[in-house]
Amino acid sequence: MEQSNYSVYADFILLGLFSNARFPWLLFALILLVFLTSIASNVVKIILIHIDSRLHTPMYFLLSQLSLRDILYISTIVPKMLVDQVMSQRAISFAGCTAQHFLYLTLAGAEFFLLGLMSYDRYVAICNPLHYPVLMSRKICWLIVAAAWLGGSIDGFLLTPVTMQFPFCASREINHFFCEVPALLKLSCTDTSAYETAMYVCCIMMLLIPFSVISGSYTRILITVYRMSEAEGRGKAVATCSSHMVVVSLFYGAAMYTYVLPHSYHTPEQDKAVSAFYTILTPMLNPLIYSLRNKDVTGALQKVVGRCVSSGKVTTF
């Protein structure tokens, strides 16, 4: 009995992104730079949306919620990863692994649904502009955010208890840099094929539901844009939607590779590389993709920077 308890609740060992990195401090500096850039850029975007009245619209409200989710998402994984890189002590407790596993699933699921519902916002803005204030009222916006978090939480509450109840009586070494589901299941000494099939169906549903909303919304948007007579209106509509489509393609593409494509088609090293892309790089890229081509956001940033420079000059004088 003692051995059984130990096999279930003992600590795990995270092997990391690169198990045998030749320059660990260089890797640490790179990951830290990406982490700080991600946190700073998302915080700046949230502040700009909050203080600039021109950005008090449903679209920017949803973007601020996406930034908040990205901050929580990257903070769930990267700090532990950085500590492991510096201390060379890669152990993570069973409780810590469970918490990380739950938060990762919840936040990832919330992003799937939020990106899907954000396409509905674009559909209403372009296809039904006269009804936009009613169809995207503040109440509707909060319902969209709540629905996204609820969808993600269901994923976390369903999969986490089942994944963590398997007896891990083989090696305790997780060939990953965080407690991701496929890497954890490889440590189980019981047959997990039935659960993996159920998880596969669950992941398909988690992707299919928001992806259906995205496909339907952008099909209607393309039809509406095609019928527009003014070139300026077309350009503005395309520019508004292109950033969202880039983010959707990056996040959904990486998730489909990891959870939908059969595991025989990719190696553990490839899994870690793809996971690093959508857990570390995507939270940094999202604010850049949405902001660089957005005149409202860049204008708000220039306005704030101008105020800071002016106040600095006055103080110095």
Swiss-Prot record:
Positions on the Cytoplasmic side per record topology: 44-60, 119-139, 219-244, 293-317
Carbohydrate-modified residues: N5
Pfam families (alphabetical): 7tm_4
GO biological process: detection of chemical stimulus involved in sensory perception of smell
Transmembrane segments: 23-43, 61-83, 98-118, 140-160, 198-218, 245-265, 272-292
Cysteine pairings via disulfide bonds: C97-C189
Alphabetical list of PROSITE patterns matching this protein: G_PROTEIN_RECEP_F1_1 (PS00237), G_PROTEIN_RECEP_F1_2 (PS50262)
One GO CC term on file: plasma membrane
Coiled-coil portions: none
Chain ranges on the Extracellular side, renumbered to this chain: 1-22, 84-97, 161-197, 266-271
Membrane topology note: Multi-pass membrane protein
Protein's cellular compartments: Cell membrane
SUPFAM superfamilies reported for this sequence: Family A G protein-coupled receptor-like (SSF81321)
Keyword terms, alphabetized: Cell membrane, Disulfide bond, G-protein coupled receptor, Glycoprotein, Membrane, Olfaction, Receptor, Sensory transduction, Transducer, Transmembrane, Transmembrane helix
Main localisation: membrane
Gene Ontology terms, MF aspect: G protein-coupled receptor activity; olfactory receptor activity
Protein family membership: Belongs to the G-protein coupled receptor 1 family.
Role, per record: Odorant receptor.
Protein name per UniProt: Olfactory receptor 2T27
Native source species: Homo sapiens (Human)
Lineage, opening ranks: Eukaryota, Metazoa, Chordata, Craniata, Vertebrata
